[in-house]
Each structure stands twice: as C-alpha cells, then as structure tokens.
Swiss-Prot record:
Keywords: Antiport, Calcium, Calcium transport, Coiled coil, Ion transport, Membrane, Metal-binding, Mitochondrion, Mitochondrion inner membrane, Potassium, Potassium transport, Transit peptide, Transmembrane, Transmembrane helix, Transport. Residues 1-113 form a transit peptide. It comes from Danio rerio. GO terms for molecular function: calcium ion binding; calcium:proton antiporter activity; ribosome binding. Residues 476-521, 554-618, 722-755 form a coiled coil. Plays an important role in maintenance of mitochondrial morphology and in mediating either calcium or potassium/proton antiport. Mediates proton-dependent calcium efflux from mitochondrion. Also functions as an electroneutral mitochondrial proton/potassium exchanger. Required for the maintenance of the tubular shape and cristae organization. Homohexamer. This is Mitochondrial proton/calcium exchanger protein. Residues 237-757 are mitochondrial matrix.
Length: 757
C-alpha cells in the first residue's frame, strides 16, 4: 500500500544545486511547515518509507470564507488546531493550485503574553517518583495488576573470593567514575566561565556529573559550595565573559550587585536541579530493578517471549522525549518529521530542535483538549487534531476519530506515555487492530540499543534503588561520545560556512573584474545598438513577473546572540529587575514544591510500611540548606538595588510599585539598539521585530523576548522569523496551562486544609 504526504512548500520554482546543498546542510525552514499549521496528509497503513509530493504553497490558496468574518474569528480565537488544505477535485493533479481552507476553531482561548520557566519543560525526578508511587498505591487499592520486581526467595550465597572480587570491582568502577565525572565537570565549568553556552545535552551531562560527585562524596558540599560563593567576585573579575558585556550602570556598585545577582541566581537554580537528582536513597535491600529492566528489554528485542502489558506500560514511561530524540537515528528523525509535516532536510541537531518544539506544542494542545473535552470538538477539529498526532484522519467515521483521540489522551496524559513513542508507533504505520501495548512493544523493539543504558539508570532512580557504578560509568561515557560527535558536526558546519563565504567573496571579485572588462566593450557595442533595436523591435516579450515561493526571513545564530545582547542593554538602560525577581520567585516555588513532594512521598510510602526504608540523602539535605541561604542573600541584593533605583528616580516612598507595562518597549527602540550592536539590513531588523510583536501593537515585552531567545540560543541552528512567532505562541499556551495548574493546586490545598481543621 502507498502513502501520500502533501506538505506545504515555500521554495522558489527553481533552485541551484549550491542553494539546495546549503539548505540541506543548514536545515533552513523555507521548505517546512510551521508548528501549528500543517497541510493535509492522506495516509494508509504501509510498512514502507514515508514518501511525499510537494504542492504549491499558500500564494495560490483561495479562501472560500468571507474575509471579514475570517478576520473577526481570528481576532477572538488565537488557537488553531489545524488549517486543512483540500485540493480542488475539478482540476488535474499536476495543476491543482487552488485549495479550500477549512479552519478548526477552539473555544474560549483568551490572549495574553508569554511567561515561561524551566519547570514547563518536564517534571523533576522527585515528581515522577511521587507519581509512580501514587499510581502503584491506587492500583493496589483498586485491586488491579501492579508490576513489582521479583526478589529471589533464596539468594545465592557467594564465596569469600567472589565477595572480594565484587568489592574490588565496585571500588575500581567507583574511583574511575569519580575521576571521569570530575574531569567532565571541570571542563564544562571552564567553558561556562569563558562565556560559552552549554547545549541542552552538555548541560544535562554537567548536571549528572555534579550530582554523581556530590553523591559519592557528600562532604564536598561543605567545601565546594561555600568556596564558589566566596570566590564569586573574583571569578567575575577574572572571567568577564561570564555575562554579556552590555552593562551600562550609573555606578560600579550597581554593576557589581547586578552581576553577582545574575550569577548567584543561575548557580542556585543549578544546585536545586542537582538536589532533585540526588534527593532520595533506599536503605532497604530490594530486587534489582536494573536487572529487571535488562531482562524486559532483552525479551522484546531478542527472545520471543512476550512481556506483560503492565511491564510494557511501566517501562515505556522511561523513554522521555528528549532521551528518545537524542538517540534516534537519522532515518527515524526524518520519518518523524515527515509524519508531523515538518522540514525533513537539515542537520540532526536542527531536526531534533523542531521536533522538540512540535512535541511541546502537542503536549499543550492535549491538555487544552482534555480540559474542553473531546466531545465538544467538531468533525473538522477532530480531523485536524488526529492528523497533527499522526493518526488517520480521512476515510473514518467521526466516532472513530473521537475514539482514537481519547485513546491518545489516555496514554499521554493519564498513563504518561511520552509523545515521541506514541508518534513513532504511528510513523511505522502499525495496524489499527493492534492494542496500545502491542504498538508500544513494536516501537520499543525498533529503538536504538544505546538507549537501554540510559533507561536502565532512570528506572532505578525512580524506584529509589541504587545503580551500580559500572552502569553509571558506561552511561556517562556513552553520553560523552554523543557530545563529541555533536561538536564535530558543528565544527564541520562552521568550516563549511567559512568555505562558502570565501567562495562567495572570490566570485564577487571575479564579477567585479568582468564588470570592468564589460565597460570597455560598451563603446564598441554602442555603434551596433541602433541595428539591434531595429532587428528586435517586433520581438514578443513576456512581461509577467517571475513567480517565487514565499520564504520566511532567516535569523542566524549570530543575530540571535545580538538580539540577546540588545535586550540585556535595554534592561540595563531601564534598570529593570522584573526577570530576576520572577526567576527568584520560581526558584522559591521549586524549593517549596520539592519539600511538599518529599512529604507526600513519605505519606505514600507509609501506606505500604516503607517510610523508614527511603530517606533524603545527606548531600541533598546539605545542598538544600545552602540554596535557602543563597535565596535569602539574593532577596537582600534585590532590595538594595530597588532602594538605589528609588533614590535615583526620586521615589522615596518604599510602597511605590512599578507601573504596568514597565517592561514594554517599542519596536523602534529595539531596532535602534540592534543597529548599534551590529550592522544589519533594515528589512531584516523589521522582520525580526515583527515576529516578536505577536499582537502587532508596536510594543514588545523585554522579558518575553529574552525567554524566547534563551530557548533558541541553546541550539546551534539558524531559524526563521515564522518559527520564532510559533515558539512564542507555544510558550503562551504553556504559561496559560501553568497558571491553571497553579490555581487548581491552590484550591486543592485549601480544601485539604479545611478538611483537616
């Protein structure tokens, strides 16, 4: 059977081979669909590779709706589940360029600005462990099947020689792990001190190595953390590139305090992440969960044994989106991009980035759909939602659409199966008759072997079990090899860019020489011009304009850095501390949630009589005290800076609050500062500013722009202005959901307090 993939095209009709190679290497978004608007895909079950046919883009689209009605609906409803392009059946296949556009409208989606934090991305290990415990206890209360690792009734008694050998191996791998972790941590720290931005993978590796060091040597908390705080002013002097060089303060004291606040805030957030990595440890001896997972993974990949559905669902949760995407092969990444109708040409890093953004958008939409209810969706909305999730959307009944969308929401939101696994099962075109567990089993069979070690560590951490040093060592070395490979790819890309620029300069010089030679021939050819005019006066000429595809303006990595510097400079000119205060409040919320999660874990464990078996690690307790002290010091720094600002502005009343819209700047202000930093064409600056101005009122929130830039800046890729606008919409949805979840948690806590009283 065949599969037909109709994707949107923004490319010109003709391209040179050099431009095609350049776009393939850089992964430009000129050919890709945006994150929320996708084209129509007609797919049937096929074990083959995804194929595709490219149709002309929206330059030839005709809207059948009344334009004024369409604009009114767009203004009051910012969220689209999809825009479906249906080719006109009256036209032949090769000439279909007129489409009927059907819009699927949501309900009650108010517009507001973007505010996002790192907590929107994923849950911490403590939260995932708590969720696992709650699910297990709930199933025990309901009498359902609960998977638990098997424990040998009579453990094999080891000889003295075997015990000595095992202890020697344990300490050998432990010391080797400590040495490698220390080496990696020092190297990453040196990169940070010298102003280099760690990639997403490098930061995860840095966090893991620091957690391992504190876990192996808990007493280092008393040495390293106070030492780092004490030497912070010295580090800022010796390594000025740690922070952007755009500080323009009125006093040296204010500059010093702001730099110290910025670095302390980043350090405290990193330490809080480390705390959650090493939070709990299990003192009781239980079944080896890592061996259970290894047996399960071997069952589904090698042997013909079929694991239970409970095992499949339980272990599928370990393959989180970032873990899965970071280890997928290129053909699998390309297949996912084609399934989601994204740009499938580009580097692996670029493909992963757009997939991560798309998965986050799907996750936000899933929560909004679950809140509104699947039954409230129209047929067009159901088709759009199913197609975006890689499910069959045409040729099926409305009841079938609702059923498969409900099944998706059940697996994703209730069973907590990662979106990447659900999409991979759709990308392989498995039969609809297969159960969800069988689909997940087949998907796990096709995952790379390299993911097994990483998932093996995760399953032990979520179960509070100890992971042996050898497994951790293998995982660390495996991740280090992947980081080196990514760095090699980036270096090759930079070299290719440099070679291309040199080639363009050579071609421009040759063109100048040819132009000079051409001027010499002008006089000789001028004598023959009258004859040429007479000959060609009757020649027919085509005066129609040359059609070119609509292409979004590309923003390079250097321009993203420049935009970040411009926002920092504007913040310093306005003496704004709103972002720092917001991040500090988020950090306080993280610390409070961490404490509440620990208390909940103890209550859940007490239901099974295991509250004494699990305790908070010593390193985690010591780091928590240090983070609380740092929060107190940062509060004092912010208070001191605000007092200085009041004195400078003549506002002596301590109760004065910042006016509404203090963070807003005009587009012209942003463009002016960007011009001062780097010489960029006017049309490029206008396109960047227009992408950031979502509501088109000429005003931009500095903190919102910084958050978007920080998200993009972690990836070494070029990005289009259209994609920047889509990221802002995605972050807006996530913030809306976060506020609703906070309000819901607050109501639940108040109700629980009333019940206790």
């Amino acid at each position: 059977m065949a599969s037909i993939l109709l994707t949107r095209s923004r490319t010109p009709l003709l391209k040179t081979s050099r431009s095609l190679k350049n776009e393939f290497r850089k992964g430009k978004l000129s050919e890709g669909a945006c994150f929320n608007c996708t084209a129509l895909r007609l797919a049937t079950n096929s074990p083959g590779v995804l194929g595709g046919i490219v149709w002309p883009h929206a330059s030839s689209v005709q809207y059948l709706d009344n334009s004024s009605v369409l604009q009114r609906r767009l203004s009051r409803s910012p969220r689209l589940y999809c825009a479906i392009l249906v080719p006109d059946p009256a036209l032949p296949v090769h000439s279909r360029s007129t489409y009927h556009r059907t819009l699927a409208w949501p309900q009650n989606a108010p517009v507001r600005w973007v505010h996002t934090t790192g907590r929107l991305l994923d849950d911490s290990k403590v939260e995932r462990s708590l969720r696992t415990l709650k699910d297990r206890n709930k199933k025990l209360e309901e009498g359902g099947p609960v998977y638990s690792p098997t424990v040998d009734a009579e453990p094999v008694r080891r000889t003295i020689r075997q015990r000595v050998i095992d202890e020697v191996k344990h300490y050998y791998h432990g010391f080797r792990l400590l040495w490698i972790d220390t080496t990696i941590a020092v190297r990453m720290l040196w990169r940070v001190l010298n102003g280099h931005i760690l990639s997403r993978r490098e930061r995860r590796q840095f966090l893991r190595t620091c957690a391992d060091v504190f876990r192996l040597l808990p007493f280092l908390v008393f040495i390293i953390v106070p030492f780092m705080e004490f030497l912070l002013p010295v580090a800022l002097k010796l390594f000025p590139n740690m922070l952007p060089s755009t500080f323009e303060t009125q006093s040296k004291k204010e500059e010093r305090l702001k730099k110290e606040l910025r670095v302390k805030l980043e350090m405290a957030k990193f330490l809080q992440d480390t705390i959650e990595e090493i939070a709990l440890r299990n003192k009781a001896s239980k079944g080896n969960v890592t061996e259970e997972f290894s047996t399960f993974f071997q069952k589904i990949r090698d042997s013909g044994e079929i694991p239970s559905n409970e095992q499949i669902i339980r272990f599928s949760k370990l393959f989180e989106d970032e873990l899965t995407l970071d280890n997928l092969t290129r053909p699998q990444l390309v297949a996912l991009c084609k399934l989601l109708e994204l740009q499938s040409i580009g580097t692996n890093n670029f493909l992963r980035f757009q997939l991560i953004m798309k998965l986050r958008a799907i996750r936000a939409d899933d929560k909004l759909i679950a809140e509104e209810g699947v039954d409230s969706l129209t047929a067009n909305e159901l088709q759009a939602a199913c197609r975006v999730r890689g499910m069959r959307a045409l040729g099926v009944t409305e009841e079938r659409l609702r059923e498969q969308l409900k099944q998706w929401l059940e697996l994703h939101l209730n069973q907590h199966i990662p979106t990447s696994l659900l999409l991979l099962s759709r990308a392989m075109f498995l039969p609809d008759t297969l159960s969800p567990a069988d689909q997940l089993k087949t998907t796990l069979q096709n995952l790379p072997e390299i993911m097994a070690k990483e998932a093996q560590v995760k399953v032990a951490e979520l179960d509070f079990s100890k992971v042996d040093n050898k497994t951790k060592l293998e995982t660390t070395l495996q991740e280090e090899a992947a980081i080196r490979q990514e760095n090699r790819e980036r270096e090759l890309e930079r070299l290719a860019d440099a070679a291309e620029k040199a080639k363009e300069q050579t071609q421009s010089q040759e063109a100048e020489v040819l132009e000079v030679e051409g001027e010499r021939r002008v006089d000789a050819e001028h004598a023959l011009s009258s004859v040429d005019v007479a000959i060609h006066s009757e020649t027919l000429r085509d005066t129609a304009p040359v059609l070119e595809g609509i292409k979004g303006e590309e923003i390079t990595k250097e321009e993203i850095d420049m935009l970040s510097d411009a926002c920092t400079k504007l913040k310093e000119q306005k003496n704004l501390l709103t972002k720092e205060k917001e991040e500090l409040e988020d950090l306080k919320d993280d610390v409070q949630e961490y404490s509440e999660d620990l208390e909940e874990i103890k209550r859940e464990l007490s239901k099974t009589g295991q509250e004494k078996a699990v305790e908070e690690s010593k390193a985690s307790q010591r780091l928590s005290k240090r983070v609380n002290r740092m929060i107190g010091r940062m509060d004092k720094i912010i208070t001191e800076l605000e007092k200085d600002k009041m004195v400078l502005d003549g506002q002596m009343d301590s109760e004065t609050t910042p006016p509404i819209g203090e963070n807003l700047i005009s587009i012209n202000e942003l463009i002016t500062v960007m011009k001062q930093i780097q010489n960029i064409p006017e049309h490029k600056l206008l396109s960047i500013a227009d992408a950031l101005d979502e509501n088109k009122d000429g005003k931009i929130d500095i903190d919102d722009v910084i958050k978007v830039v920080e998200l993009i800046d972690k990836e070494d890729i070029d990005i289009s202005t259209n994609q920047v606008a889509e990221i802002m919409v995605m972050l807006q949805k996530e913030e809306k959901l976060m506020e609703k979840e906070k309000a819901k948690e607050k109501v639940e806590k108040e109700q629980a307090a009333k019940i206790q009283n």
